[in-house]
Amino acid sequence: MIAWFYKYGFVLLLLNTILYSIPETNTIAPTIFYFLMGIGLILLIINPSQIKDVIFHRSFLFLLLISLVNLVYFLFFESEFNQDSLEFLMARFVQFSLISLSIYHNYDYYKKKFSSLIIKVISIIVVLGLFVDPDLLSGRYYGIIWNPNMLASLSVLAFSFVLMKNEKRTNLDVLLLILFFIVSIATGSRLALLIITVSFIYKFGLSIRNVFYAIIGFILLFLISSIDLNTSFNRFSSQDILNDRTDQFNFAVNNLEKKFWFGYGLSEYSGLPSNVDVPEEYQGLLIASHNGYLSIFLQYGIIFGFFIILIIMRKSLMLSSYFIRKEQKDNIFLFIVIITLIASMFETLLTGINEFHTILFWFSLSYLSYSKYLQDYED
C-alpha cells in the first residue's frame, strides 16, 4: 500500500483538483485533499530515511529549496501566526514530496502512460459536459465545470497532449483534437486561443503547414467574429486582449505597494489579498491580479518573491536549453513548462495548491529535471 501511494499519490492529488472544479463534487474534494495530505505527511514522518534519499535527490533540490524559503518566510516574516499559512506551508511541502516520490518510483509510468491518462480523464469530463449541456453557442460554455476558464484550461491542455503525441495519429486522435479545439473556443477563453496557436508553432515550427493553418484561422476569426457569439474568436476580435486585465494589474500593483517588502503572507496566493479594501468601482468584479508573477510578489513581497521566481526561471531555462539541444523539443512536459510561464502573465498560475494546470506545471518541471539526470547518467 505504501509503495502504491509513493507511485500514484501525485495522480490522485492531480485528479482531485478536477473534483474541486465540478459543483456536484466540490464538497467531497476537500475531504479527499486533506486525506491525501494526511497520509503523505504520516509517510514522511514514519519513513524519513527512505524518503530523504528522494527529497534530497539533486533532481528535486529546487522543490526543497522553495519549501525552505516558505519555512523561513513563515517562521520569521509572517505578520502573525496564521493557520491558513501553516496549511499552505505543509500542503506545498507534501505536494512537492508526492511529486518527487511518484517520479522517482514510477518514472516509466509517467513517461509512457501518464499522457494517455490525462487525455482519457479530460475526454470524459468534456463528453459528460456535452451530454448535460450540448449548447456550445449560448454564451461562454462551461459544461459540468463551474467556470468556463477552468474548462478551457482542461480542454486546451488535453488538446496539447494529443497534438504532441509522437505516435502516428489515429482517427480517434483527430476526432479528439477537433473536439478539444471546439470546446476550448466555445469557452470564450482568449488564453486558450493563444495556447492553441503556440502549440502548433511549438510542434511544427514556422512551416508551410502552419502558414496554411494560420490563413484558415484568420478566415475563421473573420467569419465567427461577424456573428453575435461569445467564443474565444469573438472576445479576441472585439476586445484588446489586455483591456480587462489593466484594472486588475493596476489594483494588484497598488496592493503590492502597501506591503512591498514582505507581502501579505503565504495564505494569500489568489492574487487578491483577503484583507484589502476593494474600491466601489470594482465591487462585484473579479479583481484578482490574473498574473502569476504579481501573485507571487503579493504573497511573499519583493525579496522572497524574487527568490521564488528566480528558482522557477533558472530551472525552467536550464531544462529548456538542455532538451532543445538534445532535439527533444516535442516533449509535452517541456511544452507545459513553457506555456505555463507564458500563461502566467495572464492568469494566476504557479501559486495555487488545488489548481490542475499549476500542479501539472510543478510535475512537468520535476519530471524534466529527473529525466535530465537519467540522460546525463546514461551519457
Q: How would you name each of these model-derived features?
A:
Residues 142, 238-250, 254-300:
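Long extracytoplasmic/lumenal interhelical loops at the membrane interface
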Residues 58-61, 169-173, 205, 210-213, ...:
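Hydrophobic transmembrane alpha-helices and their immediate junctions
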